[in-house]
A protein has these predicted regions:
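Adenosine ribonucleotide-centric catalytic and binding domains
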Residues: 12-66
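Short, well-structured alpha-helical segments in soluble
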Residues: 101-116
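Single conserved hydrophobic/aromatic residue that forms the stacking wall/gate
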Residues: 1-8
Length: 123
């Protein structure tokens, strides 16, 4: 129940999204891809047989709630939505690399870009 009306919000998601032209995710890729909140050419690189992409195809907000974040900003609940969001491949065999390397690196990047709040969006 805090006051987030002046805070900048970003989303971190695990749906292996990336933009056209960015490197796709490989099975052991612990890195992240920077997503633009305004560029809507998202592609999913999720290779798990357990991932159903129907929801993603029907509504991007099922895996990346960018429209919901924009609505929160428009209503004054948050200050604004960051232009930078991060996407990881959540279907990892070993999460140690994300926990110890790319996760902290992504957090550092977002802090440097002025992000105050990160919405974690696992799929």
């Amino acid at each position: 129940q805090g006051d987030w009306s002046s805070d900048v919000c970003s989303s971190d998601l695990s749906a292996s999204l990336h933009h056209a032209g960015q490197e796709d995710f490989a099975p052991t890729d612990i890195g992240y891809r920077e997503l633009s909140g305004s560029k809507r050419d998202y592609q999913t690189g999720h290779w798990s047989p357990n991932f159903d992409s129907v929801g993603f195809a029907a509504d991007i907000n099922t895996v990346f709630p960018i429209d919901r974040l924009n609505e929160l900003a428009e209503s004054g609940r948050i200050g604004r939505v960051s232009e930078t969001h991060l996407s990881y491949a959540g279907n990892q065999f070993d999460l140690a690399g994300v926990r110890l390397d790319s996760g902290p690196a992504g957090a550092k990047l977002l802090r440097e870009r002025g992000v105050d709040i990160v919405l974690l969006t696992p799929v």
